[in-house]
C-alpha cells in the first residue's frame, strides 16, 4: 500500500502534461504549430524568449507572497523577494523612473489601480475615444472606467486623422478633469507628451500615460519617453516589450508611488503572481541589452515598409502612414469590411484583427478596417524583404476578396497564399 502511494505521488510530481492530460497537450501542441506556421500581425502580439517561458513555468507557481518585498504576510519569501526586487530595479533602470510596481496582473488592472489611487466614483477624467484608437479602460461606456467615472472623450481631426490637441485643451478647460489619460491601442503616430503635461498643468489634472503598446519602442529609444512628463505611466509587459502578459506602473513621485502600491495591494489584488513577476524580470533584463535597441528600430522600420507597400498596392493607410509598430488599413475603397478581411487573411495564415477606423460608420463587430503590427514577425527575424512579400500577399487575398462574389470564390487565392506563407515561415523557426 505504501509503495503504491509513493508511486502515485511520484507520478503526480513527474508525469508530463502529455501523459496526464492528452486533450490539453494536443491543444497546446496545436497552438505551437499554428504560431510557427502562420504570420502574426496582431499589433499587441509578440513571441517571448525561451527564458521567459521557463521563468513563467517554474516552481514559483507554487509560492504565495502577499505584500511587497520585505513586507510579506507569509513566510519563506526570501527568494521571491529577490526576484521582485530584480524586476523593480530593472524596470526603473530601463525607463528611467524612480519607482515601479510590477505586481499588476494585467493592463486593465494596472489602470484600475490608477483610478483607485487618484479618483473617487463620479469624478471627471479625459481619455482617447475607443473609435479613435483608445482603450476600453480609458473610459469606454461598457467598461468599469466608463461606468464609475465621468469620462470626457477626445479624438482625432477628421481631415488628417491626427490627434486633435486643440480639442484636448478646449475640453480640459471646459470640464476641469482630475485626470487625463494619454496613450492608446490603435494610434500610429508620435504622442506629444510635453503638450499633454502642459494642458494637464493648466487645469490641475494628473497626467497618466498608458504606453502599453509602445513600451518596447520607448525602451529601445525609438519613441519619446513619457516618464519625464507624466505623473504616472502604466504599461503592459507583453506587446512590444516582449515579456509575459501582465502590467506595471511607473512614477517619479514618491507620494503617488505609495498611493499606487496601496491601490494594487490590498486595493485590487491579493497574492501576486510570482511566476509572472519572474518572467517580467527576465524580459526587462533582455530589454536592457544593446540588442533590444536594434530590435525596436527594426519593428518601426518594418511597419513603415509594410505601410508604404500596401499604399503602393492601392490600400488606404489611416493618417497616411506610421511612426511606430502598427498601422490601420481603411478598406472602404476596396468595398470590404474588417471582419471579412480578417477572416480571409486568417484562412491564408496571415493573422490580424478587424479594427474600427476613425469616424467609422460600421459597428465594432464589423469595422471598416484592419490593424496590422510588426513586433512578433520582427522577433522571428522577418526583415524588409519579408515585409514586402507580406504586403503583396495581403494584397493578393484582399484584392481577390474584392473581386469575388462571396468568400468561397476566393478559396483558390487564399490557398495559394497559404502555401507562400508556409514557405516564408519555414525559414524562421522558433522554440526548436
Curated annotation (Swiss-Prot):
GO terms for molecular function: glycine hydroxymethyltransferase activity; pyridoxal phosphate binding. Its cofactor is pyridoxal 5'-phosphate. Catalyzes the reversible interconversion of serine and glycine with tetrahydrofolate (THF) serving as the one-carbon carrier. This reaction serves as the major source of one-carbon groups required for the biosynthesis of purines, thymidylate, methionine, and other important biomolecules. Also exhibits THF-independent aldolase activity toward beta-hydroxyamino acids, producing glycine and aldehydes, via a retro-aldol mechanism. It comes from the Bacteria. Homodimer. Pathway: One-carbon metabolism; tetrahydrofolate interconversion; Amino-acid biosynthesis; glycine biosynthesis; glycine from L-serine: step 1/1. It catalyses: (6R)-5,10-methylene-5,6,7,8-tetrahydrofolate + glycine + H2O = (6S)-5,6,7,8-tetrahydrofolate + L-serine. (6S)-5,6,7,8-tetrahydrofolate binds at residues 130, 134-136. Its main location: cytoplasm. Signal peptide: none annotated. The modification N6-(pyridoxal phosphate)lysine is found at residue 239. SUPFAM superfamilies: PLP-dependent transferases. GO terms for biological process: glycine biosynthetic process from serine; tetrahydrofolate interconversion. Its EC number is 2.1.2.1. The keyword GTP-binding does not apply. This is Serine hydroxymethyltransferase. Belongs to the SHMT family. GO terms for cellular component: cytosol. It is found in: Cytoplasm. Disulfide bonds: none annotated. CDD domains: SHMT (cd00378). Keywords: Amino-acid biosynthesis, Cytoplasm, One-carbon metabolism, Pyridoxal phosphate, Transferase. Gene3D superfamilies: Aspartate Aminotransferase, domain 1 (3.90.1150.10), Type I PLP-dependent aspartate aminotransferase-like (Major domain) (3.40.640.10). The record marks 238 as: Plays an important role in substrate specificity. Pfam families: SHMT. The gene is glyA.
